[in-house]
Amino acid sequence: PTGAMEMKSQREIHRVSPVCVIPDLAGEITAALAGTGPALGLGEVRSTSAPSHIALVIGTSGTTGMSKEVAFTASALLASARASNKFLGAQAGQQWSLFLPLTHIAAVNVIIRSMELGTLPIDLREHQGEYPQVDFTSIVPTQLFRALNSDERLLRHLQSAKAVLVGGAALSPALSQQAMTAGINVVETYGMTETSGGCIYNGEAIE
């Protein structure tokens, strides 16, 4: 009987392709968050099922270099997205752009933040040509460095955004200053996969 109960409390994990198109993935995320679809697996996820309250599993090497799987509940993911949008003063109808790979929690966060605003992010991962204008985006320091030193299209995109989250690695004071001088509103984020991504914005805990 105990084994049967444990089986009933599990849900399937559907592994998501890293090249999945955003509208399709948004539908899968909606179902995963609502509990009407399978949990989603991103990155190196070997597990095929998860406890029923888990909506997302991400395979990560973490800070130790050891491969592991990190699980997230729907409530944790939604709370993170809402706290981020609240900190940024985001309003319904505003839009994010996506530059980050779907193997990272930060990319999923961008999608859920957008969905909370009633929109979908503009997928710029493989974009060619001029970047469209958006309200918010999330990048890593190497992308910021590229924008400031060699990629004028990306620079214009970041300059036009209301806020640019920068995380995933340490942001040097020099690069931060260069971005500010260029007119980019950088919000430095700190967090780990285990904390649903960035939970500290400009040294302040978001809630």
Language-model region placement:
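Conserved S/T- and glycine-rich ATP-binding loop of Class I adenylate-forming
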Residues: T60-T63, W96, I111, T137, ...
